[in-house]
Amino acid sequence: MTMLISLPTAPSVPNYQSLERPLNFTMAAAAKVRELIQEENSADLALRVYIQGGGCSGFQYGFEFDENRADDDLVLETDGVVLLVDPLSLQYLLGAEVDYTESLTGAKFVIRNPNAKTTCGCGSSFSI
């Protein structure tokens, strides 16, 4: 006797190339990045956002300037400023917003990530 078992299929994950804007890079963030690039005196720089293991919640965000673009990088442009995200990091950042905020407590780049299940108190690490 043969028994067939039907397993539910996993929901399909959208391919970032099929999304109009897989990540939101705000005007405020672009303006600050432009300012920082001008200080570095290198027009070829782009802001790379990435995810790495670490922090109190398991993953943490990283930011760095980069002149190199990989063929599979997501390249977003806002107001002439380029944001780069590698495919591995992008899977954790789909739908997120990269912003820059200034307040009485200081100024910083902020990632609002709808995929993060928990975040630490400082907001720089998260878990999925």
Curated annotation (Swiss-Prot):
Iron-sulfur cluster binds at residues 56, 120, 122. The lineage of its organism: Bacteria, Pseudomonadati, Pseudomonadota, Gammaproteobacteria, Lysobacterales. Binds 1 iron-sulfur cluster per subunit. Belongs to the HesB/IscA family. GO terms for cellular component: cytosol. Keywords: Iron, Iron-sulfur, Metal-binding. Its cofactor is iron-sulfur cluster. This is Iron-sulfur cluster insertion protein ErpA.
